[in-house]
């Protein structure tokens, strides 16, 4: 029996509003526990929620960027459940009238493009955060009432790789809109994955398992890969899959049962009595649509068609808005687009990955990188010397021209000076000259290396090659 994998994802994104969704409590990350909450967040008797319009605007903006249809009438509902991090014993969410429906995004895996449907996008409030220790549990209600959007995909993904690509694309789009920073390490983006298997050709879905507590896109992919294998073994051996919630354990590389999965009936949804229905007219929708910036796909196409970058460069540069904006600012300061792209995709990304930092955390500026690239273009410094300048720029900042002068890094481009060095090197390496004349091309590399060593790497490489061949041919 051949089995087909069916994957759907539920992604929670914390909106970057100044206050919570139903109260005026602040939303700053990292504050002391239980210092950013109020009687409204905690559901004290007699208090009433007030809807934050900015949260609605952000939800609409995200929904439009994801090609969703925006509701004209939408409402909030109570999702009833008891848990220590939910002080009201219910969560205000949206059940049957979400703010956005029927959206899609396009992903690419192994060179093949595929459209993934988005069932719905709805607004809701976040719960608090529980921390468990050996001698008890602690609850921080700072997160209680934070505005969230939940984005539910169609079960259109067939491999864990497609799920990973979907998450990357979704995160990129949301970041470009500016409604969230989507930092998984801070909990502003969280993902639950649903996976089931069915015989190839069968229309009815198999019984699904839900994977929770997936704190990185890599864990989502690994968890799905393991669950795919687990369910396949179970089904092929004649067993059955139970509807349950599981978590991925990185230490054992397995998914572990958490609980039997609840159905939506278990939550006893009913309309939120303290909030009226929300009507969204065409004028409001158009106001939000006009505020949507250039999104990653459009920017990528522009980089290829107008800027002239290779498709791969355009893809890498537009993965994050931070990198793309940095590229644009550097080119706007007069740097060559392709040279800038090479430095960003090479040295800059390598440094950021090694140091586990973002561009905003380093001293490098678009103006600084632009000046350095221009020095390379003018021949003032070589690409090799530029790496020394770059290390200074990204660690401490400064003016590239001043760094070059202070460290004596100006490239030697005087032909007379270089010819003298070349002649001296050749006089001391006659065997290498013979080797080169006998067809051993590696000999020229050795000679160039000796010249670069003698000039402390500051010789102009193209000029060195030209003079070297001229002097060899004279002998």
From Swiss-Prot:
Top-level class of the enzyme under EC nomenclature: ligase
GO terms of biological process kind: glutaminyl-tRNAGln biosynthesis via transamidation; translation
Keyword Nucleotide-binding included in the entry's annotation: yes
Gene Ontology MF terms: asparaginyl-tRNA synthase (glutamine-hydrolyzing) activity; ATP binding; glutaminyl-tRNA synthase (glutamine-hydrolyzing) activity
Superkingdom per UniProt: Bacteria
Gene3D superfamilies linked: 1.10.10.410, GatB domain, N-terminal subdomain (1.10.150.380)
Catalytic activity: L-glutamyl-tRNA(Gln) + L-glutamine + ATP + H2O = L-glutaminyl-tRNA(Gln) + L-glutamate + ADP + phosphate + H(+); L-aspartyl-tRNA(Asn) + L-glutamine + ATP + H2O = L-asparaginyl-tRNA(Asn) + L-glutamate + ADP + phosphate + 2 H(+)
EC number: 6.3.5.-
InterPro entries documented for this protein: Asn/Gln-tRNA_amidoTrfase_suB/E, Asn/Gln-tRNA_Trfase_suB/E_cat, Asn/Gln_amidotransferase, Asn/Gln_tRNA_amidoTrase-B-like, GatB, GatB_C_1, GatB_Yqey_C_2, Gln-tRNA_amidoTrfase_suB_CS
SUPFAM superfamilies: GatB/YqeY motif (SSF89095), Glutamine synthetase/guanido kinase (SSF55931)
Keywords: ATP-binding, Ligase, Nucleotide-binding, Protein biosynthesis
Protein family (similarity comment): Belongs to the GatB/GatE family. GatB subfamily.
Function: Allows the formation of correctly charged Asn-tRNA(Asn) or Gln-tRNA(Gln) through the transamidation of misacylated Asp-tRNA(Asn) or Glu-tRNA(Gln) in organisms which lack either or both of asparaginyl-tRNA or glutaminyl-tRNA synthetases. The reaction takes place in the presence of glutamine and ATP through an activated phospho-Asp-tRNA(Asn) or phospho-Glu-tRNA(Gln).
SUBUNIT field: Heterotrimer of A, B and C subunits.
Stated name of the protein: Aspartyl/glutamyl-tRNA(Asn/Gln) amidotransferase subunit B
Source organism (scientific name): Bacillus mycoides (strain KBAB4)
Lineage: Bacteria, Bacillati, Bacillota, Bacilli, Bacillales
């Amino acid at each position: 029996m051949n089995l087909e994998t069916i994957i759907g994802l539920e992604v929670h994104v914390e909106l970057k509003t100044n206050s919570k969704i139903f109260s005026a409590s602040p939303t700053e990350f990292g504050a002391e526990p239980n210092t950013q909450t109020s009687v409204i967040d905690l559901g004290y008797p007699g208090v009433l929620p007030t809807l934050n319009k900015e949260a609605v605007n952000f939800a609409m903006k995200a929904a439009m960027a994801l090609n969703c249809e925006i509701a004209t009438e939408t409402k909030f509902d109570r999702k009833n459940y008891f848990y220590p991090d939910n002080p009201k014993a219910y969560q205000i969410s949206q059940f049957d009238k979400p703010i956005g429906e029927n959206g899609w995004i396009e992903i690419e895996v192994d060179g093949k493009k595929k459209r993934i449907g988005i069932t719905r996008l709805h607004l809701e409030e976040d719960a608090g955060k529980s921390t468990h220790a050996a001698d008890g549990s602690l609850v921080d209600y700072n997160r209680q009432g934070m505005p969230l959007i939940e984005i539910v995909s169609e079960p259109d993904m067939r491999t864990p790789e497609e799920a990973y690509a979907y998450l990357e694309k979704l995160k990129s789009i949301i970041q470009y809109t500016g409604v969230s920073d989507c930092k998984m390490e801070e909990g502003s983006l969280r993902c639950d994955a649903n996976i089931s298997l069915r015989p190839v050709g069968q229309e009815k879905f198999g019984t699904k398992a839900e994977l929770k507590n997936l704190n990185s896109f890599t864990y989502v992919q690994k968890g799905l890969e393991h669950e795919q294998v687990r369910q396949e073994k179970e089904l092929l051996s004649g067993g059955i899959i139970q509807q349950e919630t599981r978590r991925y354990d990185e230490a054992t590389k397995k998914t572990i049962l958490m609980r039997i999965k609840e159905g939506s009936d278990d939550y006893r949804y009913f309309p939120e009595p303290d909030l009226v229905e929300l009507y969204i007219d065409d004028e409001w929708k158009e106001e939000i649509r006009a505020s949507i910036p250039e999104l990653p796909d459009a920017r990528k196409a522009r980089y290829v068609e107008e800027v002239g970058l290779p498709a791969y460069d355009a893809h890498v540069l537009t993965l994050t808005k931070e990198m793309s904006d940095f590229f644009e600012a550097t080119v706007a300061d007069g740097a060559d687009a392709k040279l800038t792209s090479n430095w960003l995709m090479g040295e800059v990304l390598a440094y950021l990955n090694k140091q586990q930092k973002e561009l905003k955390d380093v001293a490098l500026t678009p103006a600084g990188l632009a000046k350095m690239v221009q020095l390379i273009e003018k021949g003032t410094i070589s690409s090799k010397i530029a790496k020394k300048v770059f290390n200074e720029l990204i660690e401490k900042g400064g003016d590239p021209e001043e760094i070059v002068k202070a460290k004596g890094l100006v490239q030697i481009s005087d032909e007379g000076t270089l010819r003298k060095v070349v002649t001296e090197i050749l006089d001391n390496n006659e065997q290498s000259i013979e080797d080169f004349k006998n067809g051993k091309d590696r000999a020229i590399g050795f000679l160039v290396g000796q010249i670069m060593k003698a000039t402390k790497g500051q010789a102009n490489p193209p000029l060195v090659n030209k003079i070297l061949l001229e002097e060899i041919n004279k002998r």
